[in-house]
């Protein structure tokens, strides 16, 4: 089989959360460029509409849905809207997330803890659950891709809530994978390292960012397109026998032992 056929997503319907900016936008582009109909879900309607028009301008199918990923009713309606437009979601990319303020663990408030865990963990589980239920009911095979982080493997000061959530996403991925594999629904995760986005570009270009870059064996930060390979592998038939895995895309940062 040719590589172009192996990674072809024609006939698939993909839903991407956090699609209005950063990595989410790139995930939408990569999925659409390889044949999937895409549903863009986020809270910023104007950004979603602009991306939808961009995707449609390439003769790809897209629908924009304004929804809060922590609102289970809103997300159920989002899945309904996608089904009405394109059919059952067969690819879910659980990308929406937030970072915490740089607060030491003993200073994290209950409000911030619950906010970070609510978006970065709870929403991942419940939206995966919703997608899986619908795939099973429709008799569809599918792929759920959860976005974790290298902070799911190691921690840094001031990241307690975020690191806990991202580590739990990896275990959630494994738990769901074991229970859904028998029906042909694969569940995997991607753990990005430091990627330059509109949210963190000023920080990563600062002196502090330069120090982080020096600790990356490949000597650079990730670019948004650097995640396309992992995404398409897990979304397509190229990854048909992969489930419960977490692919680390970090330029070698996690494996390095500082001496």
Residue spans of the language-model regions?
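Short C-terminal tail/terminal secondary-structure segment
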Residues: 1-5, 99-102, 154, 232, ...
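Conserved glycine-rich cofactor-binding loop
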Residues: 13, 20-21
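C-terminal substrate-recognition "lid" of short-chain dehydrogenase/reductases
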Residues: 87, 220-249, 254
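Substrate-binding pocket helix/loop in short-chain dehydrogenase/reductase
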Residues: 103-105, 109-117, 212
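Active-site helix of classical SDR
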Residues: 128, 165, 173
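Alpha-helical segment proximal to the catalytic Tyr-Lys
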Residues: 133, 178-182, 240
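Residue(s) in the substrate-gating loop at a strand-loop-helix junction
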Residues: 149
């Amino acid at each position: 089989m040719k590589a172009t056929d192996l990674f072809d997503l024609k006939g698939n319907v993909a839903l991407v959360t956090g699609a209005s900016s950063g990595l989410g936008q790139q995930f939408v582009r990569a999925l659409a460029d390889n044949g999937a109909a895409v549903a863009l879900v986020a809270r910023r309607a104007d950004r979603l509409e602009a991306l939808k028009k961009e995707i449609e301008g390439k003769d790809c199918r897209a629908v924009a849905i304004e929804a809060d990923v922590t609102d289970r009713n809103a997300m159920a309606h989002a899945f309904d809207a996608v089904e009405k437009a394109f059919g059952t979601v067969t690819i879910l990319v659980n990308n929406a997330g937030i970072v915490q303020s740089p607060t030491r663990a003993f200073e994290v408030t209950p409000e911030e803890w619950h906010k970070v865990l609510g978006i970065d963990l709870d929403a991942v589980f419940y939206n995966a659950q919703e997608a899986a239920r619908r795939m099973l009911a429709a008799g569809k095979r599918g792929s759920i891709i959860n976005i974790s982080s290298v902070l799911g493997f190691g921690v840094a000061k001031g990241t307690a809530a975020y690191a806990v959530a991202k580590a739990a996403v990896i275990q959630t991925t494994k738990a769901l994978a074991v229970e859904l594999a028998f029906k042909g629904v694969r569940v995997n995760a991607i753990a990005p390292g430091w990627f330059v986005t509109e949210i963190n570009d000023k920080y990563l270009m600062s002196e502090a960012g330069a120090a982080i870059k020096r600790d990356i064996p490949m000597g650079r930060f990730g670019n948004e397109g650097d995640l396309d390979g992992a995404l398409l592998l897990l979304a397509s038939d190229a990854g048909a026998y992969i489930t419960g895995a977490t692919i680390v895309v970090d330029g070698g940062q996690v494996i390095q032992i500082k001496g």
